[in-house]
Each structure stands twice: as C-alpha cells, then as structure tokens.
Curated annotation (Swiss-Prot):
The modification Phosphoserine is found at residue 460. It catalyses: a 1,2-diacyl-sn-glycero-3-phospho-(1D-myo-inositol-4,5-bisphosphate) + H2O = 1D-myo-inositol 1,4,5-trisphosphate + a 1,2-diacyl-sn-glycerol + H(+); a 1,2-diacyl-sn-glycero-3-phospho-(1D-myo-inositol) + H2O = 1D-myo-inositol 1-phosphate + a 1,2-diacyl-sn-glycerol + H(+). CDD domains: C2_PLC_like, EFh_PI-PLCdelta1, PH_PLC_delta, PI-PLCc_delta. This is 1-phosphatidylinositol 4,5-bisphosphate phosphodiesterase delta-1. Glycans are attached at residues 191, 193. It comes from Mus musculus (Mouse). The gene is Plcd1. Ca(2+) 3 binds at residues 312, 341, 343, 390. The active site is at 311, 356.
Amino acid sequence: MDSGRDFLTLHGLQDDPDLQALLKGSQLLKVKSSSWRRERFYKLQEDCKTIWQESRKVMRSPESQLFSIEDIQEVRMGHRTEGLEKFARDIPEDRCFSIVFKDQRNTLDLIAPSPADVQHWVQGLRKIIDRSGSMDQRQKLQHWIHSCLRKADKNKDNKMNFKEVKDFLKELNVQVDDSYARKIFRECDHSQTDSLEDEEIETFYRMLTQRAEIDRAFAEAAGSAETLSVEKLVTFLQHQQREEEAGPALALSLIERYEPSETAKAQRQMTKDGFLMYLLSADGNAFSLAHRRVYQDMNQPLSHYLVSSSHNTYLLEDQLTGPSSTEAYIRALCKGCRCLELDCWDGPNQEPIIYHGYTFTSKILFCDVLRAIRDYAFKASPYPVILSLENHCSLEQQRVMAHHLRAILGPMLLDQPLDGVTTSLPSPEQLKEKILLKGKKLGGLLPAGGENGPEATDVSDEDEAAEMEDEAVRSQVQHKPKEDKLKLVPELSDMVIYCKSVHFGGFSSPSTSGQAFYEMASFSESRALRLLQESGNSFVRHNVGHLSRIYPAGWRTDSSNYSPVEMWNGGCQIVALNFQTPGPEMDVYLGCFQDNGGCGYVLKPAFLRDPDTTFNSRALTQGPWWAPKKLRVWIISGQQLPKVNKNKNSIVDPKVIVEIHGVGQDVASRQTAVITNNGFNPRWDTEFEFVVAVPDLALVRFMVEDYDSSSKNDFIGQSTIPWNSLKQGYRHVHLLSKNGDLHPSATLFVKISIQD
C-alpha cells in the first residue's frame, strides 16, 4: 500500500540519491522580501506526490502545509525569479532555487545551505515531474488510489478497517451509504477479520475501478469473445472511431502500445485492459493526436493566421492596483502566446519601466521584461513573437529602449526586412525564432532614419493606453490629459518592420487601399463589433492582407475578457485577451490555440484567406463555408472529478454542459442532470444533438460543474476542442483546471458522431 515506494520502483528511482535526500527533508531559507527570510523545514512525503512545508502560523491546518507536485510549473535554479533577483543578490546563485506554480499563487523562493542541497531539490523535483508526466492513465489511477489508501490508513498498519474504508471513499470523492459500503467491505473481507489487507485491498480496488460502460463498449467491438482480434479491432476503428487510417497496421500498433498482457500481445490480441488503456491514451483522446503537432501550412503570409495574443501581459490581476510582473510574460509564453504587450513609460535612473499608465499598478523594468522574453520566447513554440509596444517614453528613454532591445534580444530581433520580402507579409516559417516589434514608425518599410535623418519626429498617438475613453474608467485613475502627438526617435522607429501601427482610415478596395501591407490598425472590442455588424465582409477582406489587433474595452478594469470567437469569425488575427483572467473566454481561446501543435499560429479557413470572399458571419449566405453537420454527443460517465471544496466531508454533485461556439446561429448549449455525491465515477448516459452550419469556425466546449442549489455552481473542469480537431467514436475528454492546466486523471467518457 506504499504508493511512493511503488512510484520509485516503477521508474527505477528507489535508490536515487536526490529523491532519498528529499524524502529525508532539509532546512531551507524561504525568501519573501529584503527583510523577510525565515528558516523552514521542507520534506517530500512518502507518496512522492506532495511536499510538506513547516509553518509557524497559528491554527494552520495540516492540509495547508502540503502542496502537490502536480501544481508545479517548473523548478528554476539561481536568481531566475523577480524575488531572488531583488532580494537574494548577496547569496551565490548555486545556493538559490525557485518553485514556480501553475496557478497564479506566489512563487516559492528558497536558499539552500549548500549547492549540493540545491542540486538534490532541483534534480529530484524535476525527476518526479518528468516521470509523472510519462505515466499512463492506468498508472496515474493506481498511484492516486494508493495515495488515498495511505491517507485513509490512520494507524499505518497497512490494513483497512471499516471506518478507514469510509474515509478512503471520501478521499476518492464518492459518497456511499453505510449499507452499500459495508456490503463491499464484507465481500472483500475473505479472512473475516473486520479489516482488509494485501489481496483483499486489491480486490476492493478492482471492484471500485470496474467500469461497466467500458465493458459495454468492449462487447460492442468483441462480441462474445474475451479478446479483440486484429480484424475486429480494425472494424471497431473504422465503424465506431472513424479513424481515417484504420487498418491492420494501426490496429497492431495500438496492441503493441497499450496491451499489458505479453501473451495477448504475442497472439496479436487486445484484452479488455488493453482496450481501456487505448481509450485513456492520447490515441483515445477526443482531441486529435495528429493536431498535437504542427500540421498546417506555415508558409502563408502572417495575415492568414490567428495569432495567440495577450493584452496587458505585464499584469497578474486587475488594471488599477494589481501587481506587474515579468512572471506574467513567462506564463503567457509558456501557454503558447505569440504577441505580448509592453506598456512603456519613463522610469527613474533613465531606465524605462512597464506598468498600466495613469494607474496604481506596480512597475517593472523594461530591460528585465526583455530578458524574460529572450529566455522563454521559443520554449513552447519556434514561431515568431510580436512585441506590441505602447510607447510613452521621452526621447532620451526611447534611445535606452532601443539600446536594450538590441543588446538583450541580439540576433533574435528582426530589425530589417527579410531578403526579397518587401511586397507582402512574410510567413511564420520565414520568421522562425524571430522577435518582431509592433509600434509607431517613421516613413515606410525601409528605415527613414540614418545619419542624415531627423533626431526625432512627431507621430500620431492612437495607442489604447492613451485612449481610456470611458468616463467611468477615467474617474478611477489619476487624471492625465491625452496628448495627440508623440515624438519618436529613429533608433526605435527603424526596428519596426512588418507591424507599423497606424490609425484605421476605413475600408478600401484592394487596388486603392490606403493601408500598406506592413501597416496594421488596432480596434477596441466595441469598435470591432460595430465594424463587423456594419461592414462584416469588408472587414473579412481587409484581414486577408492586413493584420488587425483587437483589445478589450477600457471599462474592463477588472481584466475581464470578451468572447474572441466573433473577432476570429471576422478574420481578425491578433485578438488580445487578458491571459491573467481565467474564465470561459480564456478557455475557448486556449482551446483554439491547442490546435496546430499549440504553436500559437492557427491557419484561418480558406474562405477567410480569399481576397474575393463574400463571407460575412453576421449575414450568412451559401458558400464554401456552408456545410451543415449533425453532431451527436453522448455523455456517458466521468472519472476522478476533483473536489472543488477542499472540506474533507465535501463530495461533488457533478453535471456536464456541452456548448457550441461559432457563428451566431450555431451557438448552443445543453446540460445533463445532476449526479449527487459522486465525483469518482458518475454515470449520465445522456445524448445531445446539435446542427452546426459553419463547422470550420466552431468549437465544442465540455464543462463540468458542481451543482449548488443555494448559490452559483462551482467550476470543476473543462475542455474546448476546435471542430476539426474533434475525434469521433468512444473517447475520453481530458479536463483542464480553471487556469488551463491538465487535471492529471479527471476525464469524461463520451461517444461522438458527426453526420452530414
């Protein structure tokens, strides 16, 4: 019943010195500020899933002193966070490390007694994170159940009495009445000792994890046989799963990958266990495995792609008083974001700073942000990053900005047109591992400066930070008159190549267009919606050859988001959302951009790339986009839905909502009934049907909520899948947390079919 020992043995780490050191624990200095350093004891728990941290706070619960390794985004060595950069410069880098969490909680900055201790912690945690990520769903399930068993075994005798079984079921997030729990307990207690041990616990585990719905699906495929032959598996892959490449080769590869029985594998058979392993794998995911890599044509002009884009990237919270942080840039880049916003203002000591102008948000150095971008720009994707500069700096500090851009970004920075690319926008492929600037520019594509150029020139100032047109917003921030002109130095201007910010002058026919291909306009969400309503097709055509950036309305001081879908339907590429604000809009956004390998660029459908298109999402007509499909979604069951309320006695009452996002007439929502007191294995067996007219623009969102009769339902998890990435047949939908991180074992089991 020792899940940690099982984990170490499974991965050959039982004698690993790093993990042995973590299991023993060590005294570390926790750093919060220049005046706050406290010695605390940290120790890896025996389950190899959690870290215990000593706390001196009075009345702190034991649970609050634990954090899960699953919640760790990364472990950094040295002065690699703002905290250690500011508050631990006096300590050698080889004694410092940081634990960065997936959600927006504070980073844990630590100082170790010696470099060897740092190595143990950094390498040990990385090994657990890497090995946990490589575990299949069955191993994750076993590891999780063993952890719950260990927690429930209060007296640590490796036996389970009836009370401990009840506690165990609560850990699993399932409420069972006493008589049913007692019935299972007696069935497993073969030794009649009023406790379960060894094989009895294994029997109990098997009874608990048996899935009748998998048995039913297996029987559909295998008939009365105990195993699936290659021929029957091919038939299942063709007729149920609708796999395009269904054939003996695919069937054999699935048997080879997922069948745990060596005997069955040798006989080219798949058992029920192998069938479940397949359905829980990436091959059985409702999101297409083929779309987990870059598969689209990346050689088209930038304007032909949707670009993952962040608004006010520097903010971690709201836009009036919240903290600014380089960590916010790192998080956005790690989520595949390719367009970041830098709101630049004069700072002390001739160093430009970034913050939300005229407000009380905290300030960070421009140069520190550039270093973070340099280090993380291409970790999640090799495709270009666009830095959207909101420049409010004096001429002197603009020159400092230009110096930092060259010195810090070096050859990553695109500071001149690509050879031969002077008549249309370059492609993402041509711009691989390049950083582009979006901002004001003097003159045209080629530099206007040089030795004989002017030292500075006026340009119109239409950026959004100066815009804050909503009176309600203005009343909440420091009064600052808007200036119509901004002086711009050539050193900075010359670095803007393919993304020159201009005022939008209206739609023209391509032959008489007043906007050059390298010029782009920004629109507030309200203005963009107005243009889509009044001139929808003109906006679509404009966006075939030009980039358009959309940003949230000025009244969204709480950093709330708008729906990106309408903007995408109009062909707008750089639809900027507040990445720091979780919610349905961000769910749909990240769902769209998990397509094409999560590289941050998604090719628009052909009818949004055609300069002669007649498409208008607000006035649909017949055309290549009109391809009505009937979508049937059968919500069968859920698995290991996480507790929302961490109260020990709390059990979730889950319900599933299926939403369609797309053009107006396709938007729809359906929901299941509520299953009470069962987050471990709820069964719904509920079928929904949707008719989708423009599937190329549709996304399907699966959301699970915890029903509450007296207040708003609590969010449990969700997954949003672009229509063209949705797989048919029996599939598992792997749920994400509100911050977009994968719940390790939480899934929905569904059956999907699409018909003309």
